[in-house]
Every structure is written in C-alpha cells, then in structure tokens.
Amino acid sequence: MSEFIAENRGADAITRPNWSAVFSVAFCVACLIIVEFLPVSLLTPMAQDLGISEGVAGQSVTVTAFVAMFASLFITQTIQATDRRYVVILFAVLLTLSCLLVSFANSFSLLLIGRACLGLALGGFWAISASLTMRLVPPRTVPKALSVIFGAVSIALVIAAPLGGFLGELIGWRNVFNAAAAMGVLCIFWIIKSLPSLPGEPSHQKQNTFRLLQRPGVMAGMIAIFMSFAGQFAFFTYIRPVYMNLAGFGVDGLTLVLLSFGIASFVGTSLSSFILKRSVKLALAGAPFVLALSALVLTLWGSDKIVATGVAIIWGLTFALIPVGWSTWITRSLADQAEKAGSIQVAVIQLANTCGAAIGGYALDNIGLTSPLMLSGTLMLLTALLVTAKVKMKKS
C-alpha cells in the first residue's frame, strides 16, 4: 500500500497542508465525542421518560463503546476501495441519524439502535483518522494536525457532560439530541465542502489487518498502548473517591480539580506537536514514566490538597502526549498500512479502557483506596520500559 499512498498524496498534499479539511475532521471528532458522552449528564430524565432505570439507561453508553470496538476492527476491511471522502460523509450521516433516533426513541430498543449507529461512526472514524490526517498535510506537519484533532477531543471531553446537563434543564433531553443532530448536519456540509477526494485501497493491495502484528516492534507498540490506556482508566475512573477520601476534597473542590485537569489536557495536546517533532519515542517513553512518578507522589503525599491538585495538572499535561504520540507513531512507522494499524489501535484502546476501569474498581473495593494509583503507576512504568526496549520508530 506504500505505492498507493505515495500516488494519492499529490504534490499539493505533500507541500501544502489542507487546514480546512483538518479542522472539518476535528469538528466531526468533537461532535462524535460530545454525543458519545451526552447520556452521562442526561441519564435521569432519559430513564424517567423511557420508563427504565438509570442503570439500564447507562447501557446506552456501553453499547456505543462495544460497537465502536468491533467497528474499528472490521471497517477498513469493508471500505477497502471506497473513496474516503464518501466514507467520512457516511460517518457524519450516521452521527446525525443516531441523534435523531435517540431524540425520537419511545423504547429502550430504539435508543440502543440509535446509540449503535453512533458506535459505528465513532469506531470507524477513529480507525481511519490517522491515515486521513497523513493524506491532508505534509509529513512534518502530521503531529501538528493530530494535535488539532486531539485538541478538539480534549475540548469535547471537558464540555460534553456539563453542556448536556445545562441544556437538558433548559430545553429537555430530546431537544439536546436534536441540537446534536444539527451539529451532525453541519459536519456533513463542512466535510463535503472541504475534504478532497481520497481514493481507497486497490483490491490487489489488500492485506489482512492482524498480519501487521508480525512486524518488528508492532506487537510491543500495541501492548504499550494497552498498558498506558489501562493505566489511565485504572486511576482516572476512580479520581472522585481517591481525591475526596485521600485529599479531603468536597464536591466543589473536586470540580475545580477536574476543570484544571481538563484545561491542562488541552494545553498538553496543543503543545504536543512541538515535543513530538523532537522525538516521538522519547515522548512515548517519557510521558508514562512521568505519570508513574506522579502516581507514586500522589500515593505517598496525596493527603495534601496542593500536592493532589498539582498531580492532577501534571497528569493532564502529560497524558495528553500519549494519544497524539501513538497516532504519530502509526503515521511514521506504519505509514503503508495506517488505516489497518489505526483499526487495531482503536480496538486496543477500547479494550484497555474497559479492563483498566474494571481492574481498578476491583482493586479499590478489595485492596484499598490507593490501590488504583499503584496499579496505574505500575502499568505506566512497564509502558515506559517496553517502549524504550522494544518499540521501533522510523524518522519522518
């Protein structure tokens, strides 16, 4: 597929970045993330309206993640020869359809169908996001373009829940999803206007997705991705009980800590391109090492509110390097099969998020308050060591 990519990255694409297309992709990603997490702040009215429990309504988030994991694995096999411009438009249509189905849902089954449509769009879009980016900008600009996309993710993660809750009180949960559908329509038009034709992979160049794992350093990279994201979710999923019981934060104080984390994450994402230009491997090894030290500091001295707040800020700044860094690794080291590598990466991250949260919860309930921190720190340290020893990196 290397010849395919080279042939289809025209002279303009190589020398001049298409920022309008990059920002349209970033906006689409932000909309997907916002819609993914809208139910978190709307569970109570959704459950009451549909006559189900909040726990059952919460499965609308679970089904999205579950479908996204499988969609990410198989989407590139399905769309091999299709122009990626039409594929992205299809994902934006699925986003819009999902919002409308949820808005008009009169049963739990229809709600799940709507959320499954979102999962298809979410998993598919993430699977091809890295390869899309590398076909829209010159190679040296890829980290900057990825930082724009992940910056949009950071903003979406910060505003999704509070925005959904605020608007839900004003206009009702169904109209919140109607408004999200309007964002989906805007995505469709922006993509049609800005995204150029991006031919798919010719049939004679098809390759089994999982054969990529046989390449030197790729399996190590995917294991490192798994451990870093599992470590993140082992800690961050339980930041509320840890910070409220260990450091003594109240609800208002915790809100400020989470806001500080979100702002730091956005800043870290914005600065990531400058760091990754110097050394991707150093960033991918250094970031989890700093996080391992942060987990140790919080375990030992987390009862001090200043220390705990500082760790949250450092964590947000540092972890922001990891998703951008691994996407950059794919665009450089697996450029000839970036879509398939992206598919595996998304599935690994979804699995890691689930496992990290589950094991962290078990540790919290059965070992002690700081056990999620120790688990997270151990996984981050192992990630740093694995990246240093085994992960291969090609220069841009």
UniProtKB/Swiss-Prot annotation:
Membrane topology, Cytoplasmic segments: 1-21, 76-85, 129-147, 197-215, 277-281, 327-343, 388-396
Location of the protein in the cell: Cell inner membrane
SUPFAM superfamilies found in the cross-reference section: MFS general substrate transporter
Chief location bin: membrane
Pfam family, one: MFS_1
Superkingdom, taxonomy of origin: Bacteria
TM region positions: 22-42, 55-75, 86-106, 108-128, 148-168, 176-196, 216-236, 256-276, 282-302, 306-326, 344-364, 367-387
Alphabetized PROSITE patterns for the sequence: MFS
Catalytic activity line of the entry: inosine(in) + H(+)(out) = inosine(out) + H(+)(in); guanosine(in) + H(+)(out) = guanosine(out) + H(+)(in)
Segment forming the signal sequence: none
Periplasmic face of the membrane: 43-54, 107, 169-175, 237-255, 303-305, 365-366
UniProt keyword annotations, A-Z: Antiport, Cell inner membrane, Cell membrane, Membrane, Transmembrane, Transmembrane helix, Transport
GO terms of molecular function: antiporter activity; purine nucleoside transmembrane transporter activity
Record's bilayer topology term: Multi-pass membrane protein
Entry GO terms, CC: plasma membrane
NCBIfam families xref list: PRK10213.1
Family note: Belongs to the major facilitator superfamily. DHA1 family. NepI (TC 2.A.1.2.26) subfamily.
Job of this protein: Involved in the efflux of purine ribonucleosides, such as inosine and guanosine.
Name of the molecule in the record: Purine ribonucleoside efflux pump NepI
Source organism (scientific name): Escherichia coli O127:H6 (strain E2348/69 / EPEC)
